[in-house]
């Protein structure tokens, strides 16, 4: 029989201070975006840049090395660690080709490396990917259909229609993950879009 285990929730394991109060300070955000000590986690179509070493880890790039890309992609402040601000930057908008960042790492599907990441790295990547996917799916107001714009360090989108101006916030969708067992066997499933050989619990 399979022994039940408890796996920590990656979304609850982050070590960053999410800097809620600082998100509204545009001057502080602008200064941090250009600060050489700030770090950026690039993503391309939801795939984070992963540094392949002895163990995979997020490939954080100095903000000054990638500052021009902030104008082309969606970005969000993930938080601060001490004096270092950490941002996520989605570079795969509108079918753009993946930029060549091979000197830092490779864009990798999170499911391929998630189970072998350190807990804090998994938390950072899950948070960044979720937030960037939310931006991609909320470019238009659900109330009036007008375009939305990012505000508060990427943690809010606001309708650009002045008659509407509704703020939109990231949400967390509830989900259930289960393992169906019978003796020493387990039922697994897969999606047709997944790479060959990849299976999952239900």
Predicted feature residues:
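Short, hydrophobic/proline-enriched secondary-structure or compact coil segments at domain edges
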Residues: 35-47, 86-89
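Short acidic-hydrophobic surface loop/beta-edge motif
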Residues: 76-81, 157-159, 180
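Residue-level detector of short, conserved catalytic/binding motifs and their immediate flanks
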Residues: 38-39, 76, 176
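A broadly conserved sequence feature marking short terminus-proximal activation segments
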Residues: 66-137
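Short, Gly/Pro- and small/polar-rich lid/capping loops
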Residues: 1-29
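Conserved Nudix-box catalytic region and its N-terminal flanking loop in Nudix hydrolases
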Residues: 19-23, 28, 32-34, 44-71, ...
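Cys/His-rich short segments
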Residues: 127-177
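Beta-strand-connecting loop/turn residues
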Residues: 83-84, 155, 184-185
């Amino acid at each position: 029989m399979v022994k039940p285990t408890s796996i920590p929730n990656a979304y609850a394991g982050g070590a960053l201070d999410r800097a809620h109060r600082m998100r509204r300070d545009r001057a502080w955000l602008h200064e941090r975006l250009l600060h050489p000590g700030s770090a950026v986690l690039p993503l391309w179509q939801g795939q984070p840049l992963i540094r392949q070493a002895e163990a995979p880890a997020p490939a954080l790039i100095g903000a000054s090395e990638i500052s021009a890309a902030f104008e082309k992609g969606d970005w969000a402040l993930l938080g601060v660690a001490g004096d270092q601000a950490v941002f996520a930057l989605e570079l795969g908008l509108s079918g753009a080709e993946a930029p060549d960042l091979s000197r830092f790492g490779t864009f990798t599907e999170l499911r391929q490396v998630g189970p072998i990441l350190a807990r804090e790295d998994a938390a950072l990547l899950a948070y960044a990917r979720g937030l960037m996917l939310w931006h991609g799916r909320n470019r238009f107001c659900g109330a009036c259909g007008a375009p939305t714009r990012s505000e508060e360090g990427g943690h809010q989108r606001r309708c650009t229609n002045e008659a509407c101006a509704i703020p939109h916030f990231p949400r967390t969708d509830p989900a259930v993950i289960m393992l169906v067992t019978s003796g020493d066997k387990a039922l697994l499933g897969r999606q047709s879009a997944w790479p060959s050989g990849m299976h999952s619990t239900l």
